[in-house]
């Protein structure tokens, strides 16, 4: 049975990262430190700009976040690729939430624009993705537009974020 709530707290996101939310072998979020949000505040199957689904998530920013120490020394800024990855994570989560099977992978995007930075003095990052299309076949494909705001100012815009869910083909690596 899939968990179909309309919001998720941090512990729920960790459960998703362990493969416990959508079933073994299905969509998972990465675990920390690559999990790029603290909560999903809203998820719907029919909302958003295109009426095909919507996800909103938040990250509480503080100067102790791992990436500020290394990117860059004496000039800390959240790498733009991490904000982009958060939006891909949200599209993959949505696909698992609506019933898609198999592990997820980011497949690309059409366009990305940065007009600001996430710095240590920012309090909160809000991520938003609006689903444009979900293709349901052997490969589940989600396409969405998204944005990131830092303290209520939109500073990233992404168009045509693409994430696919694939039937498991790779063998697990023995540890």
From Swiss-Prot:
CDD domains: FabA (cd01287)
NCBIfam families per the UniProt record, alphabetical: fabA, PRK05174.1
Record protein name field: 3-hydroxydecanoyl-[acyl-carrier-protein] dehydratase
Family: Belongs to the thioester dehydratase family. FabA subfamily.
Organism: Rhodopseudomonas palustris (strain TIE-1)
Keywords from the named record: Cytoplasm, Fatty acid biosynthesis, Fatty acid metabolism, Isomerase, Lipid biosynthesis, Lipid metabolism, Lyase
Gene Ontology biological process terms, A to Z: unsaturated fatty acid biosynthetic process
Assembly and binders: Homodimer.
Known EC number: 4.2.1.59, 5.3.3.14
Catalysed reactions, as listed in the record: a (3R)-hydroxyacyl-[ACP] = a (2E)-enoyl-[ACP] + H2O; (3R)-hydroxydecanoyl-[ACP] = (2E)-decenoyl-[ACP] + H2O; (2E)-decenoyl-[ACP] = (3Z)-decenoyl-[ACP]
Active site residues according to the UniProt entry: 71
Subcellular localization: Cytoplasm
GO molecular function, one term: (3R)-hydroxyacyl-[acyl-carrier-protein] dehydratase activity
Main localization (coarse): cytoplasm
Pathway the protein acts in: Lipid metabolism; fatty acid biosynthesis
